[in-house]
């Protein structure tokens, strides 16, 4: 007769959340209870998913019903032979896919899967969602649809949240992740900006605005002195717009604003995030970013005064908006110009204030203006970033008449994101096909996006075909291979991995241009067209420096691009062009990295067992990928690793990424503002393009989070 132990009785009566919570409790031997998380997955499916899933007699009946009742978009399915569609669904369900963690399964079923209109029952499993995404993005191409299905089911490629959530649904938001818009120094542009915030937020995107062009507080209006209210009232209007707009009630809109460090309102701008700020100026939900040029660091090094220049005067004097001026290059000229009003603050005091605000709020983000523009291969100027600080693209101004109609449609920015899982890519049978499939999938998102409510976004997307291929699971992969994050081997791998991805990404974009007979607008003026983009790859030696990394690529069967391959690619690009103005950007990957069982982006883990605060559900626990009780020493967390090794890692990747990378800096609870400033200076010297949040270890607050942009966080 079988005996029943107290432990077995307890496990059989525990629900899936209780089982998942046991990840955070050691067993009697002092080990992490990874098996309890696997039991939580089984319990979740047995007691929740299956009882709440709608069943159908066949896939054919399921598709017919979902189209007829308004769940699936028949236009997507109609582009294929129905027999192929049924085979692809069967192929997906035969893949043997299984969620690796409870949080991954829970995230998918609460946030991504198609539900009945009352929200109570599930109409999809993971394989179904993947297949609908693949069918949508392949646009009738059976081969591409199959490849996308395989890449997603294997975990090698994952589209960002808006794409993965909305593809194939009849009632959906846009497939696009994020938007960046300029605001010019006139009421028409400001009014358009508020409307754009409403329209884009309603469609599920994160939206960033450039404020640098707006005249400062006290500037003239129609030549009458001391009339302008400056940037803060505009920030207030935008914050209210984002609070009002949300995607089908799913989440509050998310917005960011960027201001140049040499704008006269910069200190008022930073003060809006102080904990004790007056309610009249306090900004609670809008994210802040500061654009800092090289000259600011030089002035701080010299302990000199830094000049803040009037955007109103710059526009009148030079015929250009403030954001289109290279302040470092023209600093002395602007100082000497008596027609440009200027005020002065101490440069070191500015950095001290910056660190104080970051200490209190985690903001602002930082974009290193001159570093970004030196690395930019596209003609034009980059003067802002996005809600997650990884999108870096050129823009151009729009003009309006008194009716707010466009007299000239400029180019604003949208970016279509998706990420590769580094561990699975290194296991890919064909890394070239993996990257090509991802680039083609993301390009489809761009091709299918037409944001008519904001014509400057539509025009920018139509001209640029810009995408952002990201990466995740770097720490997970390194740990799996016995490599410490930030070690010489880790830096060597990061450099050569991104080097290899870059060749395949550019090669795919060249093939797209050759197939379609079309490049992005402005290709002829780019460093791709001149061949200058390829100089670093033709001059430097791109081979592993460590035996460990050489062995990793050899084991994976990956051929590192040779100088001859780069020469051939350069010649092909100069002949055919490339289709995508921008190709890579590394976002902070949130929800999707849990579904993929990946470490977030390319930064280290924040804890061996991460504690997530998930709305009304409470705490959910997530074990780091590939972690066992035998390799825990490979999983040092970001706070212990410290900012320098993280910056070193990002610097290796930055050499190859044409846009930016979301880089969060982590500090122990003993950190000071001086530590933050030292890390910022180190990042600038290492060629980092932008900095995302500042995070201080606060043990009392573990399991809480500051919500950023769900779109960009994937």
UniProtKB/Swiss-Prot annotation:
The gene is nrdE. The record marks 709, 712 as: Interacts with thioredoxin/glutaredoxin. Substrate binds at residues 161, 177-178, 206, 386-390, 588-592. The record marks 178, 415 as: Important for hydrogen atom transfer. The active site is at residues 386, 388, 390. Keywords: Allosteric enzyme, ATP-binding, Deoxyribonucleotide synthesis, Disulfide bond, Nucleotide-binding, Oxidoreductase. Its EC number is 1.17.4.1. Provides the precursors necessary for DNA synthesis. Catalyzes the biosynthesis of deoxyribonucleotides from the corresponding ribonucleotides. R1E contains the binding sites for both substrates and allosteric effectors and carries out the actual reduction of the ribonucleotide. The record marks 185, 215, 222 as: Allosteric effector binding. It catalyses: a 2'-deoxyribonucleoside 5'-diphosphate + [thioredoxin]-disulfide + H2O = a ribonucleoside 5'-diphosphate + [thioredoxin]-dithiol. Belongs to the ribonucleoside diphosphate reductase large chain family. The record marks 692-693 as: Important for electron transfer. One of its GO terms (cellular component) is ribonucleoside-diphosphate reductase complex. This is Ribonucleoside-diphosphate reductase 2 subunit alpha. GO terms for molecular function: ATP binding; ribonucleoside-diphosphate reductase activity, thioredoxin disulfide as acceptor. Under complex allosteric control mediated by deoxynucleoside triphosphates and ATP binding. The type of nucleotide bound at the specificity site determines substrate preference. It seems probable that ATP makes the enzyme reduce CDP and UDP, dGTP favors ADP reduction and dTTP favors GDP reduction. Lacks the N-terminal activity site. GO terms for biological process: deoxyribonucleotide biosynthetic process. Tetramer of two alpha and two beta subunits. It holds the Pfam family Ribonuc_red_lgN. Disulfide bonds join 178-415.
